[in-house]
Amino acid sequence: MRAIAVLCMVEVHTAAIIPPEGVTVGDPMAFVAAAFGGMAAPMFVTISGWGMYMSAQRRRAQGFSGSDWVRWIVPRVLLLTACQVIVNLFLNVERGGRFEWQTPGVLTLLAVAAILSPILSRIPFSFRSAILLLACASPVVLGDTSGPELGWFERVGSEGIFEWLERLFVNGTYPIAPWIFYVILGTLVYDLRESPDVREKGIIMGLIATALTILISAIEEVDWALTEGDAVLTFFPASTPFLIVSGTMAVLAMRILEGSEARGGEPAFGDKLTFLEPSGRLSLTIYVSHFAVLGIAAMVLEGEPRLALVPAFLATSIHTIVWIPLAIAHEKYIPGISIEGLLRTIQSGR
C-alpha cells in the first residue's frame, strides 16, 4: 500500500511538471491524472498515520519513558523537516519549480503526526473517532480562513513566522487542519485491523456519501472535482466532501489489498505484488529523490513549449515506474544507504 501511494505521488507530481499540450480539465486523461493525484496524498498520509500509530503502540507496550519518547520522536521530526526543506530546494520557484524553500508540505505534516503519535496511542478509539469527525468538519468551520482565494504561489509562500504558521496549520498545501483527518483515519484502521466487517460497513457508508456528492454535482450543475475552484470536491483547500471521498477510497484500497489476511487467509493478490515491497520500504527516499529529477526537468523545460501528449505520457510513466526496479536494486546492492537507513542508524538501540 505504501509503495502504491508513493508511486501515485510520483505520477501526479511528474504530470504537473510535464503537462501535455492540448489537454484540458474536461479531458478523460486529465480526469485520470487528477484521480491519481487526488488519491495519492490521502493514501500516503493515511498509511503513514497507520505506521506511526503502530510503532507508537509497540513502544508504549515496551514501557517507554518520557526520555525514550523524546529520543524516538526528535530524530524523526528533524529528519522529516530537513527532507521537506530539501524537497523545496530541489523544486524551488527560482529554478522553474513550485515551492519556496520554507514551504510546509506533506513531510512537515508527517513530522507533526510523529509528535502526536505517543498522545494518539493513549487516546481511546471513541475519542479519536470524535476527533476524526471534527477534522472532517474543519473546512466548513474554517471557511475563508483556509484560503480558497489563494493562488498556488501565495499558498506556498509566506512572509514571516505568523504567515508560515498559517500555512502549516490552516491554509498551506497540506495544513494540519484538515489533513490530520488522514492521520487519525490511519490510527482507526489499525485498531480495526482484526475487524474487517466493521471496516467494510464504514466503506459502504463512504461509498454512499460519494454517490451523494456526485448527485449534488449533477443537481447544482457544478464540477464534481477540481484541484481548486468551484467544485464539490477540491484539493486546495481540501473540502469536507473531498476528505470523505478520498478517505473512503484510501480505506477501500487498503481493504482490497488486504484480501482475507484478517481472517487468516492470503492477501488479495497473493505474492504477485511482492515486487513492490522494496518501493514501500523506501517510500521516503523515493519521495525525496524524485523531486531531484523533477527539479532538473523543471529547469530544462522552463520557458519551453509543452510536450506533445505521447512524449509527456511516456515521460510521466517512465519516471513513475523506474523507481520500482531502482528500489529492488537498492535493496540488493546498497540496502543501508537511504533516508530510512539513516533514521534507523540514528535511532539504533532504541
Describe the function of each predicted region.
Residues 1-350:
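Alpha-helical transmembrane segments and their immediate juxtamembrane cytosolic regions
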